[in-house]
Amino acid sequence: MSSHVPADMINLRLILVSGKTKEFLFSPNDSASDIAKHVYDNWPMDWEEEQVSSPNILRLIYQGRFLHGNVTLGALKLPFGKTTVMHLVARETLPEPNSQGQRNREKTGESNCCVIL
């Protein structure tokens, strides 16, 4: 599909945890929730083993970050007419914005300084 992407659309290559991939065309106005619903409603036959019970548990990961449902592709400044790769995972909830490691670092009260002579 990536051989011809309309100039006003964004081609998403979605990768499952299993490594299976599929490409879908979306508008820049489509949100992560819209994408999850579209993929759920058009679940590829070769992804049958990974079929989920609801579109509400499908999550997109882009550049190492989970996308919240209301984030649009346009807001991510994805290039039109090109293919962008994202991961698609089944997960009930999104992780907290601060990881446990970040919270632990904040609680230590240590500070680092650099002395330049």
From Swiss-Prot:
InterPro entries (alphabetical): MUB (IPR017000), Ubiquitin-like_dom (IPR000626), Ubiquitin-like_domsf (IPR029071), UBL3-like (IPR040015), UBL3-like_ubiquitin_dom (IPR039540), UBL3_Ubl_met (IPR047977)
Entry keywords, A to Z: Cell membrane, Lipoprotein, Membrane, Methylation, Palmitate, Prenylation
Gene3D superfamilies: Phosphatidylinositol 3-kinase Catalytic Subunit, Chain A, domain 1
Covalently attached lipid (S-geranylgeranyl cysteine), positions: C114
Listed CDD domains: Ubl_UBL3 (cd17048)
Species whose genome carries this gene: Mus musculus (Mouse)
Name of a matching Pfam family: Rad60-SLD_2
Protein name: Ubiquitin-like protein 3
Source taxonomy: Eukaryota, Metazoa, Chordata, Craniata, Vertebrata
Modification Cysteine methyl ester, positions: C114
Residue ranges annotated as propeptide in the record: 115-117
Annotated lipid attachment (S-palmitoyl cysteine): C113
Protein location: Cell membrane
All residue ranges annotated as the Ubiquitin-like domain in the record: 10-88
GO annotation, cellular component aspect: plasma membrane
Bilayer topology annotation: Lipid-anchor
